[in-house]
Amino acid sequence: MNTAPFKLEADFASALPTMAAPWQGEEAPNPELVILNDDLAYSLGLDPTWLRTPEGVQFLLGLNPEPLTKAVAQAYSGHQFGQFVASLGDGRALLLGEARSADGVLHDIHLKGSGRTQFSRGADGRAVLGPVLREYIISEAMHALGVPTTRSLAVISTGRKIQRGSVAPGAVLVRVATSLIRVGSFQYSNISGGIELSQHLANYTITRHFPSLVAELSAPTPATYVSLFKAILQRQADTVGKWTRLGFVHGALNTDNTLISGETVDYGPCAFMERYRGDAKFSSIDTYGRYKFENQPMILGWNMARLVETLLPLLGATPDEGMTAAQEALVEFDDLCEQAIRKEFATALGLDESDTGTVEQFRELLYLHNPDITTLLRALTDNTAPPSGFEAFVHDWKTQDPDIEAMRAVNPLFIPRNHLVEAALADAVEGNLEKFHELLAAVTNPFDPTAGPDELRLPSEEGFEEDYMTFCGT
């Protein structure tokens, strides 16, 4: 056997065994590595050469015990479209363990589509190639755009044919996160283990994500957990600020899809708008627009309220003190989101974040004229003609001496536009990955004009977005 040159840790499984069910991936009849993210593998101390061996592919499927310590399915609850489900968990996923990057940070190595677990609730636990490649390309694009996100390490085709409306090739996604601790993780700890387990999970979260609070864990006080909650709020606000600047619609902001780290997770029904509008939604199952673009800050606030409900006994010496502390922190979330959004747009416009007047004027024009935000911001960056309705704004904006070099670093030329992603995936599931690799090269170097052909910069044809719909699909 080709021995693995690394071994994963089992940090989560060891620290929180009641939230981790030991499990193993499903055997694949004819596994084949479709794509491997070499740079990400190197950064995590994982040898790409070994990962390409048969033993490496088995490891990526959760089957080779050599580099594994204790693969587990994680337990969590969740509000899905506002409805609480007490036991969700990894129904088709596995945490293989954690890899430690050169800076000492632990990263979850996590499978999606690895087969049934005890949380599958009757589903087959599998995933199909198109949606798996979709998550790969969009998550890596988001990383390149500077958005906190889970990342994609590999895609493996399983050789299995999966029934999803039509027959599709089976696949497994190997994704990476600084952790997959969710709001739903705290909801599960609260109902299954009460405040003792919730405090244990909170302490573990601090060690994984908030090192400035670690020193307080030797003798934690209510202030420790208030600080934790405030830090989580800030991370959510920072992320939604970036989504808002980029015109990104997540589409499934359930509490089980809201990571404590602030990283974006679950790219099934997401989309990038090409007409900037508050009512934009693309998910086929978001019938009433709960997760439409303009609702994202509000929904994250709602999710944060569900989180703090699980922490109330930790936030004060008495129930009243805990409730007061929670309310005082939570009431600030709207302002945190607004500050983050204004900061993002100020940076995109090359202005100081204190210039709120210009930023607000720009935002008003976005909702009035519904431009393609990517094209518009690059037009400003490159001093080309802006779309109709922005002429007067641009004239005034230029008088403020915007920092054009700073703008070049944040305003992309390439994003994973919906029509381009769909075309690449349609070819990929038929075995032709040429368009996929071409688009991946462009969107992972989004500020480099030489990263892809000019047609990858262009919006879709008129009318495409009006009919475009996304599906979880996996």
UniProtKB/Swiss-Prot annotation:
TM annotation in the entry: none
Gene Ontology molecular function terms on file: AMPylase activity; ATP binding; magnesium ion binding
This protein's UniProt keywords: ATP-binding, Magnesium, Manganese, Metal-binding, Nucleotide-binding, Nucleotidyltransferase, Transferase
EC number: 2.7.7.-, 2.7.7.108
A Pfam family this chain is assigned to: SelO
Catalytic activity: L-seryl-[protein] + ATP = 3-O-(5'-adenylyl)-L-seryl-[protein] + diphosphate; L-threonyl-[protein] + ATP = 3-O-(5'-adenylyl)-L-threonyl-[protein] + diphosphate; L-tyrosyl-[protein] + ATP = O-(5'-adenylyl)-L-tyrosyl-[protein] + diphosphate; L-histidyl-[protein] + UTP = N(tele)-(5'-uridylyl)-L-histidyl-[protein] + diphosphate
Binding site for ATP: 89, 91-92, 112, 124-125, 175, 182, 266
Residues at the active site: 256
InterPro entries xrefs: SelO
Cofactor(s) listed: Mg(2+); Mn(2+)
Positions of Mg(2+) binding: 257, 266
PANTHER family to which the protein is assigned, alphabetical: PROTEIN ADENYLYLTRANSFERASE SELO, MITOCHONDRIAL
Family from the record: Belongs to the SELO family.
Role description: Nucleotidyltransferase involved in the post-translational modification of proteins. It can catalyze the addition of adenosine monophosphate (AMP) or uridine monophosphate (UMP) to a protein, resulting in modifications known as AMPylation and UMPylation.
Full protein name: Protein nucleotidyltransferase YdiU
Organism: Corynebacterium glutamicum (strain ATCC 13032 / DSM 20300 / JCM 1318 / BCRC 11384 / CCUG 27702 / LMG 3730 / NBRC 12168 / NCIMB 10025 / NRRL B-2784 / 534)
